[in-house]
Curated annotation (Swiss-Prot):
Protein name as it appears in the record: Alpha/beta hydrolase domain-containing protein 17B
Protein purpose: Hydrolyzes fatty acids from S-acylated cysteine residues in proteins. Has depalmitoylating activity towards DLG4/PSD95. Has depalmitoylating activity towards GAP43. Has depalmitoylating activity towards MAP6. Has depalmitoylating activity towards NRAS.
UniProt keyword Lipoprotein present: yes
The gene coding this protein: Abhd17b
Post-translational events: Palmitoylated on cysteine residues located in a cysteine cluster at the N-terminus which promotes membrane localization. Palmitoylation is required for post-synaptic localization and for depalmitoylating activity towards DLG4/PSD95.
One BP term from GO: regulation of protein localization to synapse
Taxonomic source organism: Mus musculus (Mouse)
Annotated membrane topology: Lipid-anchor
């Protein structure tokens, strides 16, 4: 006890020692769904309907490149999945775990734009309790959700692990790190990552307690794939120090991207974001 900081002591005695409680306080802000999925009579084909709040930025032709379906997780929830065919000759598919306050409808335009610019297809999914997915968002469900997405990507589309880039943004780095620590892939990209829930809420926390949530810091050293970390230096939600700490623990780090002046939600608006991704996907992965 003598080695604990004041903030750690406060957390220890004031917060219930339960990862789920910490997670619910910190992490999950599911929006009202911005899309619906309608199934045909055969039960095998799903149609995506976007609401105005999805802010779709492309034509119906681009929308035809999006395939959606539902799959079941090991926890019994049915989650919505989205496969975006951005490029006919794409070597890699990004398995994209999005942030905590959006759903697939809101992300669909971003996926089209990103994939077409870096020549990758994109596979994504909604966490339990988000969008059309059933259940509730919890830490355990996050891990089951990404596992189900990984299995669907591999079995439904026949995509091999060496052609999958695991990509996580913000809270999405939590399922991404967990998956990448258990399965090898072409690469891992962590965009505005966190070290753990306690370390976000209490920045002076120096170690992982049994009741901490989202312990990326303890899992990242188990990742054997190349890891690219991207973080804004002025991140007001997850401090830049989290990206640095994770980078230092990587087995196979590549040159990170520290975006000078960027916050938590605008990294992708800086030109060097796309430049770094293009370089990583089209040049560096070939030689790794």
């Amino acid at each position: 006890m003598n080695n604990l900081s004041f903030s750690e002591l406060c957390c220890l005695f004031c917060c219930p020692p339960c990862p789920g409680k910490i997670a619910s306080k910190l992490a999950f802000l599911p929006p009202d769904p911005t899309y619906t999925l309608m199934c045909d009579e055969s039960g095998s084909r799903w149609t995506l309907h976007l609401s105005e709040r999805a802010d779709w930025q492309y034509s119906s032709r681009e929308k035809d490149a999006i395939e959606c379906f539902m799959t079941r997780t090991s926890k019994g929830n049915r989650i919505a999945c989205m496969f975006v065919r951005c490029s006919p000759n794409a070597k890699y598919t990004l398995l994209f775990s999005h942030g905590n306050a959006v759903d697939l409808g809101q992300m669909s335009s971003f996926y089209i734009g990103l994939g077409s610019r870096i020549n990758c297809n994109i596979f994504s999914y909604d966490y339990s309790g988000y969008g059309a997915s059933s259940g509730k968002p919890t830490e355990k469900n996050l891990y089951a959700d990404v596992e189900a997405a990984w299995l669907a990507l591999r079995t439904r589309y026949g995509i091999r692990p060496e052609n999958v880039i695991i990509y996580g943004q913000s809270i999405g780095t939590v399922p991404s790190v967990d998956l990448a620590a258990r399965y090898e892939s072409a690469a891992v990209i962590l965009h505005s990552p966190l070290t753990s829930g306690m370390r976000v809420a209490f920045p002076d926390t120096k170690k992982t307690y049994c009741f901490d949530a989202f312990p990326n810091i303890d899992k990242i050293s188990k990742i054997t794939s190349p890891v690219l970390i991207i973080h804004g230096t002025e991140d007001e939600v997850i401090d830049f120090s989290h990206g640095l700490a994770l980078f230092e623990r990587c087995q196979r780090p590549v040159e990170p991207l520290w975006v000078e002046g960027a916050g938590h939600n605008d990294v992708e608006l800086y030109g060097q974001y796309l430049e770094r991704l293009k370089q990583f996907v089209s040049q560096e992965l070939v030689n790794l």
